[in-house]
Design a protein with these regions (language model features):
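Beta-strand-enriched, solvent-exposed domains that form extended recognition/catalytic surfaces
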Residues: 1-102
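Juxtacatalytic substrate-recognition/specificity segment
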Residues: 105-205
């Protein structure tokens, strides 16, 4: 079975366990972040029983500092194993949304934009999102964009939450009580403070 644990905002632990008649010598975690070309692999710690053949593998992916990964991205992963004879084994692929597990997240779809949020009224989020998306469509038309690619918005409620979710470069702004937003084009996601239409429009364009 495959499992993951989010230790937000520092790291994600990926776990695989099961039974194999093969004598596994190597386990590797392979992952992809969002629809981007950002992929990677991590060699896993592996334990296997000699008799029962139960095995356990664990990998940790850093998500902060120089390895910062923004909230809201979808992460796909699977494990590859090799036995003592060099035979290769591949697990199923699993995917999940990388969000702070301390909150009960909901999502709202507006056109090509998926909004992740918590602590607000759904109607307020939907209204703000719809107004912002109209402005985003107008900006796209001016830029002669034929189609708006799917993207994601993560609503950050307050400076305390922003301190964990935003990249460390924003610490100075947070100390001043400011928290605006950050867009991550490569990941197709942006983080924004509050559900104001102007903020959603600015980061969305």
């Amino acid at each position: 079975s495959l499992n993951h644990e989010i230790n937000f905002p520092n790291e994600i632990t990926f776990i695989i366990n099961g039974y194999s008649q093969a004598d596994l010598r190597q386990l590797t975690l392979n992952y992809q972040i969002g629809e981007s070309k950002v992929t990677g692999y991590i060699h896993s710690e592996i334990e296997q029983e000699i008799v029962g053949k139960a095995f356990f593998g664990l990998s940790k992916l850093s998500t902060s500092g120089n390895s910062y990964i923004p909230s809201g991205v979808r992460i796909k992963y699977y494990f590859e194993g090799r036995d003592m004879n060099g035979n290769q084994y591949v697990s199923l692929t699993k995917e999940f949304d990388y969000l702070n597990p301390d909150y009960q997240w909901r999502d709202t779809q507006v056109g090509a934009m998926t909004i992740f949020w918590h602590g607000f009224q759904h109607l307020d989020v939907a209204k703000s999102g719809e107004k912002a998306y109209v402005a985003i469509q107008e900006a796209a038309a001016i830029s002669n964009l034929q189609e708006i690619e799917p993207f994601r918005a993560v609503i950050i409620n307050n400076p305390r939450e922003a301190a964990e979710a935003f990249p460390t470069v924003s610490n100075a702004s947070l100390k001043d009580g400011l928290y605006g937003g950050f867009a991550f084009k490569d990941y197709g996601v942006f983080l924004i403070g509050g559900i104001g239409t102007d903020g959603l429009t600015h980061e969305g364009t």
